[in-house]
Amino acid sequence: MGCVLVNDRRILSTGYNGFPKSISDDLSRYNDRDFKISITVHAEKNAILNAAKNGTKVEGSTLYVTFPPCSQCASAVIQAGVATVVCPNPIFAPERWVESFLAASNLFCEAGVKVLYYSDADLCLTETAPSVEPTG
């Protein structure tokens, strides 16, 4: 999972899913799913934190991400003042994330953050919010 924050065609910051700085990321920790999930810093938050650490303002920027933001990352994106999010359409995501993606979509809508969804198949941008329903 990766993320790039851009403004005026200039890269402001990048981030990726990973353990916090100085925390060992040996294979046994990645294989313990509960532990991994509990400490992983998502790409969006890493990009925002990296920008803050470097004194880079991200307000009004566009966030490009390789996976739809979860509700926690959506909150951070909104709080940082990001104006636009470009991400894959969540209808193609694993079912376990659907609830969080729906919450994120609602948060973005309420906060006025523009979201452009794309599909890997055609990489066409659209402003139509996805219709995501759990399957199975």
Give the residues covered by each predicted segment.
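Zinc-dependent deaminase catalytic domain
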Residues: 1-136
